[in-house]
Amino acid sequence: MPSSISVKLVAAESLYKRDVFRSPDPFAVLTIDGYQTKSTSAAKKTLNPYWNETFKFDDINENSILTIQVFDQKKFKKKDQGFLGVVNVRVGDVLGHLDEDTATSSGRPREETITRDLKKSNDGMAVSGRLIVVLSKLPSSSPHSQAPSGHTASSSTNTSSTTRTNGHSTSSTRNHSTSHPSRGTAQAVESTLQSGTTAATNTATTSHRSTNSTSSATRQYSSFEDQYGRLPPGWERRTDNFGRTYYVDHNTRTTTWKRPTLDQTEAERGNQLNANTELERRQHRGRTLPGGSSDNSSVTVQVGGGSNIPPVNGAAAAAFAATGGTTSGLGELPSGWEQRFTPEGRAYFVDHNTRTTTWVDPRRQQYIRTYGPTNTTIQQQPVSQLGPLPSGWEMRLTNTARVYFVDHNTKTTTWDDPRLPSSLDQNVPQYKRDFRRKVIYFRSQPALRILPGQCHIKVRRKNIFEDAYQEIMRQTPEDLKKRLMIKFDGEEGLDYGGVSREFFFLLSHEMFNPFYCLFEYSAYDNYTIQINPNSGINPEHLNYFKFIGRVVGLGVFHRRFLDAFFVGALYKMMLRKKVVLQDMEGVDAEVYNSLNWMLENSIDGVLDLTFSADDERFGEVVTVDLKPDGRNIEVTDGNKKEYVELYTQWRIVDRVQEQFKAFMDGFNELIPEDLVTVFDERELELLIGGIAEIDIEDWKKHTDYRGYQESDEVIQWFWKCVSEWDNEQRARLLQFTTGTSRIPVNGFKDLQGSDGPRRFTIEKAGEVQQLPKSHTCFNRVDLPQYVDYDSMKQKLTLAVEETIGFGQE
């Protein structure tokens, strides 16, 4: 039986701003089944309009489609009509069966508040934001004549009322509503809806009339029957947002387009289940961001709402599930739960048992499903079992209903659910997956949040060490936790990430240079460095070590890599772990071999050693006791193990105790000691320095092209040139284009830009006589379309090895 409903359009938020210098004047057009049309007033110059206007719609059934479109009044007469987004809502999905008694215990109509993300139309124009809508079924009134479904809007005379916040009420027909922004706008709205220029309204109108035109004038069927008779037990008939009928089997929690029959066998039902599963998988594979590339190694997260989601229109289904909206018929909330509403009208749920809140309706079991590189399900967990997101995290949906996550602590985004294990390829080493989980936890801690404001540091390239020392040491730790803004003297470049990456790259080369006597190369090789025990030759050495500790902490805090590797023992010392004999191998291989030989062989009568060590200090040999009166205690087979432990402790730790303490004082001013202990020494090395080895195939795999395609000759020449270079030249190219020669542990897929992860990009730009130009903040290189390989290689090499400094376009 047809019913009447009330639709209150509360507000919209975060609308898309198409003009740089002005905000839109948004108004909304509400349409039921394509022939009942209402319009709100226009809110002036805002991206967050607040209407709070109520509309009444008659002759509604649960299959009716409510379409809400948002336009910019200033542009409504233009070609695109100032389109700002559309939302389609099936009334039955929100209010349930309209023939049921849905009144509350107080006799007032039950209201359902929903929040829906705005969607694109067929023209593909970018939209953003969401609508807050309140729907309620009105009490039954006296019978009235029903207009035939074949009548157009211009011939109908049904009346409705429009209620606004100021209390005024006016009467309007379908053609003319006094609540329209203007008379011209109202006529334009009507003509637009009749001509079908808006794809969403046109689709809903066509599908509704095609399916219901023959039956709506005679009888309205319930969800459990149709013109062919009653459905089998446990089956229900529903209509998606485009008016297409599908069937829900509540027995198996599956959906199908095929109408079930009473004699349907279990085998047929099983085949249908498999078919639906495969259909859902194919739909999921096709979900990508607009303009994005489909990468088999990436992981897609899908939110589902059980049997309430039809087998098509996954975008609307995922958007509905993400809002955590309720559906009538779900029953009472579990014990200890309460439903509340935000000031914007969005429903949320309070669990008084655990004193937590969630957007997810506990009566609706939602799943987060993770797909692997072969598009097979590798994880499926209920949202309720995953628990809340870490502090500062938020889950959002793209325009294509793909779930992504926002880390407000670091102002970055990611596809990966921070509550789930690593979404890396399944063939990567286990330590990388473990490391990623630890990093997510580490970054989510309140102490690692970037504070409001900016920290400005200005340095000269030729005096970067001393200038950085003066700038960083004069700042308080709280100031250093604000967003870093690095400025090179005499250069115009703005720091959106690339300048600061180059700052840390250049500074690490200077402050770890043995020329300053603060660090020295290990005896094992000339690549790893260790603290110089004779750094005291510089009377200010402890202040410099505190400064270096601050720089390392700054790099970790702001996600910047340092171009240096310490000996492994230093990372263990930072974690307060005890050093052992194996750590000596990276410090001095000859000493390690000698101590190891002592443990494996008898030394009685062979070695004449005591519990002391000789330390050379600027040409003077000083004897140091490893234990009290150690120089008079002989080393034997019985106590040689103790000697090895004491000598290792002295050789690695005790000689540099003062310098290391100053270093850690500076480091812990930005990174609390208890947080960094979640890592082991190998992971801490990756956290500070990233990975130096460059994988060309991984680089190519995670590269985007603008103006070029991967098959273009210039691109082939570029990768041929990179392949011919050695690792040092590749590192220089990476530093030229991104500001650092290091890459994250997850490879090029996790390269960071100015606003979060940003892939390496090659753009077609510049004249052939020009050198390539880099944009380090955006990991982008402008590569002209050179005419031959030799000229491209020559100019690329010249740009990488000879250019210096930042400019501004």
Swiss-Prot record:
Alphabetic keyword roster: Cytoplasm, Cytoskeleton, Isopeptide bond, Nucleus, Repeat, Transferase, Ubl conjugation, Ubl conjugation pathway
Cross-link (Glycyl lysine isopeptide (Lys-Gly) (interchain with G-Cter in ubiquitin)): 258
Impact upon substituting residue 733 to S: In RSP5-1; impairs ubiquitin-thioester formation and catalysis of substrate ubiquitination
Enzyme Commission (EC) number: 2.3.2.26
Location of the C2 domain: 1-105
Example of a GO cellular component annotation carried by this entry: cellular bud tip
GO BP term (any one): regulation of actin cytoskeleton organization
MF (Gene Ontology): phosphatidylinositol binding; ubiquitin binding; ubiquitin protein ligase activity; ubiquitin-protein transferase activity; ubiquitin-ubiquitin ligase activity
Organism annotation: Saccharomyces cerevisiae (strain ATCC 204508 / S288c) (Baker's yeast)
Compositional bias of kind Polar residues: 139-148, 184-196
Subunit structure: Component of the RSP5-BUL1/2 ubiquitin ligase complex composed of at least RSP5 and BUL1 or BUL2. Component of the RSP5-UBA1-UBC5 ubiquitin ligase complex composed of E3 RSP5, E1 UBA1 and E2 UBC5. Also forms a ternary complex with RUP1 and UBP2. Interacts (via WW domains) with LSB1. Interacts (via WW domains) with PIN3/LSB2. Interacts (via WW domains) with RCR1 (via PY motifs). Interacts with UBP2; the interaction is direct. Interacts with HSE1. Interacts with LAS17. Interacts with ROG3. Interacts with ROD1. Interacts with RVS167. Interacts with ubiquitin.
Xref: CDD domains: HECTc, WW
Entry protein name: E3 ubiquitin-protein ligase RSP5
